[in-house]
Amino acid sequence: MTTTDPVQLTADLVRCPSVTPTEGGALVLLERLLTDAGFSCTRVDRGEVCNLFARWGDKAHARTFGFNGHTDVVPIGDEAAWTHDPFGAEIVEGVMYGRGTTDMKSGVAAFAAAAIDFVQDTPPDGAVVLTITGDEEGDAVDGTTALLDYMDAAGEKMSVCLVGEPTCPNHMGEMIKIGRRGSMTAWFTVTGVQGHSAYPHRANNPMNGLARLMDRLGSHQLDEGSEHFDASTLAIVTIDTGNPATNVIPAQGRAAVNIRFNDLHSGASLTDWLQGEADKVAKEFGLEVDMKVQISGESFITPPGDLSDLVSRAVQTETNQAPELSTTGGTSDARFVKSHCPVVEFGLVGKTMHQVDENVDVAHIHQLKSIYSRILKDYFS
């Protein structure tokens, strides 16, 4: 019986300094491991980003279980603030420390270990695919999207996909993500007429219009939530003039808002609403208001059904806890996968991700491998 140690693999990956978009040796390590286990591996590098596609079994099989994860990590920040080497994978009293221990080298290691053992011990009638990117924490332009583009061009398929992001807020097994809110940011530049603050009638203060616009946006209730989502939110994230002089009315003011939106909206519909509000303020104050928008991802939902039931049963069997089906939190690469096949997310407890002394309970890594192993077994049974 094959036994691939997910803790050792996690440690090996953590010791690869793969701060996005640097590959750092992590994908090289995975490619070698998976190739030795009989997987067909293809590097799908695009731009400055390295990605790995790995498949065991027949290409485009009708029953192909897919996994998506990333080996890139966020910067460590001030290394002096760390108690443990951020790339040392030190284990102290059953806890492993290091950047990526939670987000999400442990998830990648747990699934890789589960998949290797599963296909070698009980070869299924089907295929197992891993799509591992080095561009999830960065711009996410040449990562999972590049892998999906490659799959489309090569005729590769996933019937379903599990994303291994840390989904549990506090306790192992408590939450599965079946969807995500959309995310977009809008930047506003309001241009008026500069002047002396003692003679405001000779100027046109852009800050008056900018303040009105931010008040209109910030006080507006986008919705009250939907069946599977909480209410959409709009946060004012910056207001700036770049003006240090208190006796000068500035010529320009700038602000930005970030919107996390549910399935009652789209990036396009919200862009139209924002533009309409900007136009009203421009007309009211006689100002020029320019807007630039970036839509990071649309909201999506994989309705509760076969895939979420499959994962829920495995989680409950291994943890004795019935997981909540949730759409909370930020964006993930599931927003790209959802256009390819049904997708859900399940992984470890994410309390320390991106923090100094990021860490994971090593027992949870073993438990996650057991959950992933059961998911594979049940999917192909």
Curated annotation (Swiss-Prot):
Cofactor notes: Binds 2 Zn(2+) or Co(2+) ions per subunit.
Its job: Catalyzes the hydrolysis of N-succinyl-L,L-diaminopimelic acid (SDAP), forming succinate and LL-2,6-diaminopimelate (DAP), an intermediate involved in the bacterial biosynthesis of lysine and meso-diaminopimelic acid, an essential component of bacterial cell walls.
Residues making up the signal peptide according to the UniProt record: none
Ligand binding (Zn(2+) 1): 70, 103, 165
One Pfam family, short name: Peptidase_M20
Residue numbers binding Zn(2+) 2: 103, 137, 354
Gene Ontology BP, a term: diaminopimelate biosynthetic process
Cofactor list: Zn(2+); Co(2+)
Similarity field: Belongs to the peptidase M20A family. DapE subfamily.
EC number(s) reported in the record: 3.5.1.18
Superkingdom of the organism of origin: Bacteria
Quaternary structure note: Homodimer.
Molecular function terms, GO-annotated: acetylornithine deacetylase activity; cobalt ion binding; succinyl-diaminopimelate desuccinylase activity; zinc ion binding
Protein name: Succinyl-diaminopimelate desuccinylase 1
Key words, A-Z: Amino-acid biosynthesis, Cobalt, Diaminopimelate biosynthesis, Hydrolase, Lysine biosynthesis, Metal-binding, Zinc
Reactions that this protein is recorded to catalyse: N-succinyl-(2S,6S)-2,6-diaminopimelate + H2O = (2S,6S)-2,6-diaminopimelate + succinate
Enzyme active site: 72, 136
HAMAP family reported in the protein's UniProt record: DapE
Pathway assigned in UniProt: Amino-acid biosynthesis; L-lysine biosynthesis via DAP pathway; LL-2,6-diaminopimelate from (S)-tetrahydrodipicolinate (succinylase route): step 3/3
Coiled-coil intervals: none
Enzyme category, top tier: hydrolase
